[in-house]
Every structure is written in structure tokens, then in C-alpha cells.
């Protein structure tokens, strides 16, 4: 869910940062040769994109790393790392228009979650950026259906009364 803080003016030299749990790019599925999440990222005009639950495949009928790199070609710098104890299945990625000088996984006890520390050169400054994959809120399928209904129809009786 986007969180937007609006201002009448954008400060000079501001940086646009996008953090997104892409949830495996929706199973890497393509619709008419495109992935909606990837299109959103491409159109975001962010300077730096931090992604959690990052994934790609070599199967050309699904979303491949090559497709992602082609869509995000204006980001000259990228870093993709495995995180968590079961690290082969969970990746965190950073795509940046600014040089990524270094990256390191921040280790802590978790099966799937993790964090990566990046040092990014922005003009004359070196900025520390933490890309963090937070613990799941453990919503059930039923909870997710209710949540989607709330977003679509916030005035519905079910939402107002908190009924399942």
C-alpha cells in the first residue's frame, strides 16, 4: 500500500526512494508478456529501489533476470543478496542510479527475513541505506480476502462492524 507524504515543494537535491515487497513478482507470472509489479517499478521514477522477496527465473515463459534488468536499465547499479537462514529462497535487491559502494547482509536469527546494509555514493556524500525484509504479519487467506474487501469498499457494513 503506497504511503505518500505530500509537500507543496520538493526540496532541491531530494532523493526518491521506493521500498517494495514484490512477493516474488506475483509468482513471476507474465500477462501479455509483462509483469505489473515490474511495470510499476519502472514507471516509479525512483532514484533507488529496494526490493524484498526478490526472485527471477531462467524460464522464458516467466519473469527472467534479463527481463528485469532490461526494464530497469536506467538503474546502472544493482545488488542482489540472499538473506535469512533459508537464504536460497529469499533475496533482497537494490537498484540504484547512484553507485553502490558496498553491501553486506546484517545477520540475525530468522528463517526467511533479513536486512542488507548498503553504502551508496550520492554526489559527495556516502549514504547508509538499510533494506529490511520484516517478519510477516501471518495473515491467513481469509484475512487477506477481508483486507482486500476493506480496501475496495471501506464503507461496507462488514468493515464498519468488524465482522468476518
Per-range role (PLM):
Residues 2-9, 29-30, 48-147:
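Structured beta-strand-rich core segments of catalytic domains in phosphoester-bond hydrolases
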Residues 17-22, 37-63, 129-132, 158-164:
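Active-site beta-strand/loop signature of hydrolases that rely on acidic residues for catalysis
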Residues 45, 72, 151-155:
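Generic secondary-structure transition motif, activating predominantly at the C-termini of alpha-helices
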Residues 19-34, 55-58, 138-163:
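Acidic/histidine-rich helix-loop elements
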Amino acid at each position: 500500500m503506497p504511503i505518500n507524504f505530500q509537500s507543496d515543494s520538493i526540496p532541491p537535491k531530494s532523493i526518491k526512494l521506493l521500498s517494495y515487497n514484490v512477493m516474488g513478482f506475483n509468482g513471476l507470472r507474465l500477462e501479455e508478456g509483462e509483469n505489473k509489479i515490474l511495470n510499476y517499478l519502472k514507471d516509479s521514477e525512483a532514484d533507488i529501489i529496494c526490493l524484498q522477496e526478490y526472485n527471477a527465473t531462467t524460464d522464458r515463459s516467466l519473469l527472467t533476470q534479463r527481463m528485469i534488468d532490461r526494464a530497469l536499465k536506467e538503474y546502472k547499479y544493482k545488488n542482489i543478496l540472499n538473506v535469512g537462514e533459508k537464504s536460497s529462497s529469499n533475496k533482497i535487491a537494490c537498484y540504484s542510479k547512484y553507485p553502490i559502494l558496498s553491501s553486506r547482509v546484517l545477520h540475525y536469527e530468522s528463517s526467511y527475513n533479513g536486512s542488507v546494509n548498503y553504502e551508496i555514493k550520492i554526489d559527495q556524500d556516502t549514504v547508509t541505506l538499510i533494506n529490511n525484509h520484516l517478519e510477516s504479519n501471518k495473515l491467513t487467506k481469509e484475512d487477506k480476502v477481508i483486507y482486500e474487501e476493506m480496501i475496495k469498499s471501506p464503507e461496507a457494513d462488514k468493515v464498519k462492524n468488524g465482522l468476518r
